[in-house]
Regions:
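Alpha-helical adaptor scaffolds
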Residues: 323-387
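Alpha-solenoid helical repeat scaffolds
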Residues: 216-217, 248-249, 281-289, 324-328, ...
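Residue-level recognition of tetratricopeptide repeat
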Residues: 220, 252, 292, 331-332, ...
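Terminal, low-structured helical/coil segments at or just beyond the last alpha-helical repeat
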Residues: 412-469
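Short coil turns that delineate tetratricopeptide repeat
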Residues: 241-243, 275, 320, 355, ...
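Short, acidic Ser/Thr/Gly-rich low-complexity loop/linker segments typical of extracellular
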Residues: 96-116, 170-185
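Short, ordered, surface-exposed loop/turn motifs in non-cytosolic proteins
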Residues: 77-93, 153-168
Length: 469
């Protein structure tokens, strides 16, 4: 289980994470400057402002049929977005788009060569300002978008650079970047993780560097248009790939675009240091940033190398509140069968350095179970679970070990309790899918079981007893 400072789980009623919970390489948004409103994938009650312009009429008169042009901001201003996935619906109205494939009044598609949508039909006449038209990423049943407004008003904040991230198994991963539309809207990120939390970052080093951000945005758009060759040509011409941090930013973007191999290439470039920097030690902060990306890319050999260096330096400083890197590395390595011996060594190093804690006992128990020592692994995970029953990773690993060892009734009891306590997260999601456990979140996104579960989990909860497990 991860050290408490680095847990990835969230409750079932999760909202936009606080700035304090975001990765250190992102600065929090200034509350005195901006406000962000989260848009969820609900078919009704859309509240975002429009983002398209009509092309069917010379003057924008109300009409029941029209086509819109997806206009996106970039470093040079607004421009049509050809061959780009989009999402469009009638904003804040009792009316809806007719004949959509899903019947929910929301139309998904890809713009044509001029950036236009398909023809849209509605029951009532509308102007272009009655629609919300935004770029779309992904094609899952769950989704999010944001709208930026100036602090203290409903005035939108257009052309503002942003990055959206989502917690994954091994860290906070970029899922999109770009500029807000003229109505302050981000793209719509569509995914298949039930109740997955998405964060918006608008005040970071990468968003403040306008020239470099524009280069990343251009590459992102090419990949969104399914133009991999065009994206690679832009990467080859980029100027912002000189520093290690710029290379890591590009690697994060490439991972978001589904280009993991190319992302690994740029991650490895950060380890090729030019003369005379090659003779200087890598700064701890830079190594930590590199370690974050190595974890996201699933590179256990590099994670182990960088973690060991940081642990050695950490032991010299003896910081009482330092992250337990040995435990976190052990938990990461447990996902790679060939690295289980190193994982166990790291887990035992954690217990030796900081003493037995619920989280590192849970980590060692999980690793021992994976190495065939199921009884001892379950004993340690039981101790961890009694102290941290609402930790989604402990609930996932302990329950999954019980289930794999044939104790399926006990695993079901544990997960029933987690469901009652509204425990949820990406790891628990994967474990329940493997076991075929019938969780409410495995129903359609706007179904009655999902809505009822969300409503219940939004209420105050009382900690349940766990002694029987």
């Amino acid at each position: 289980m991860k050290h408490p400072q680095h847990r990835s789980g969230q409750s079932a009623s999760s909202a936009l994470p606080d700035a304090a919970s975001r990765p250190a390489w992102f600065a929090s948004a200034s509350a005195s400057c901006l406000a962000a409103v989260l848009g969820l994938a609900a078919p009704a009650a859309h509240a975002a402002a429009p983002a398209g312009t009509a092309t069917a009429q010379v003057s924008d008169t109300p009409s029941r049929t029209r086509s819109l042009t997806l206009t996106l901001m970039d470093g040079n201003g607004p421009a049509p977005a050809p061959h780009t996935p989009y999402r469009v619906f009638v904003t804040g109205s009792n009316d809806e788009i007719l004949d959509t494939p899903s019947g929910d009044g929301i139309l998904h598609g890809v713009t044509d060569a001029e950036g236009r949508t398909a023809q849209i039909r509605t029951s009532l006449p509308h102007t272009e300002d009655d629609f919300t038209l935004i770029r779309r990423i992904g094609d899952g049943p769950w989704g999010h978008f944001f709208q930026l407004q100036r602090s203290g008003s409903t005035e939108p904040l257009p052309a503002w650079p942003y990055i959206m991230t989502m917690p994954q198994r091994w860290g906070e991963q970029w899922v999109d970047l770009g500029y807000t539309t003229r109505q302050g809207a981000t793209a719509y990120f569509s995914h298949d993780v039930p109740a997955g939390s998405v964060s918006l970052h608008i005040d970071a080093d990468v968003t403040r560097d306008s020239k470099c951000f524009a280069e990343l945005d251009a590459v992102n758009r090419k990949f969104a248009q399914n133009d991999a060759d065009g994206a690679r040509a832009l990467i080859g011409a980029m100027r912002c790939t000189r520093s290690a941090e710029q290379k890591l930013d590009l690697a994060r973007l490439l991972l978001a675009a589904g280009q993991a191999d190319l992302a690994r290439h740029w991650l490895l470039q950060t380890r090729q240091r030019p003369f005379p920097d090659m003779f200087k030690p890598v700064d701890d902060a830079d190594r930590r940033k590199r370690l974050e990306v190595e974890r996201l890319l699933g590179m256990p050999d590099l994670v182990l190398e960088d973690s060991n260096v940081l642990q050695a330096r950490q032991s010299k400083k003896r910081a009482a509140d330092a992250t337990d890197l040995a435990n976190n590395t052990a938990y990461f390595l447990a996902d790679f069968p060939d690295y289980l011996p190193q994982a166990e060594e790291q887990a035992r190093r954690s217990l030796e350095r900081v003493g037995p804690r619920p989280y590192n006992q849970g980590t060692l128990g999980w690793i021992l179970a994976l190495r065939g020592q199921t009884a001892e692994g379950l004993r340690l995970m039981r101790l961890a679970y009694r102290d941290l029953p609402r930790d989604e990773e402990i609930a996932a690993e302990y329950g999954l070990t019980l289930w794999r060892s044939g104790q399926k009734d006990l695993a079901a009891r544990l997960w029933d309790q987690a469901q009652r306590e509204c425990v949820w997260g990406v790891r628990l999601h994967a474990a329940l899918r493997e076991a075929g456990y019938p969780h409410p979140y495995f129903h359609p996104a706007d179904s009655e079981p999902v809505n009822a579960y969300r409503a219940r989990c939004a209420k105050p909860r009382i900690k349940a007893k766990t002694a029987g497990l």
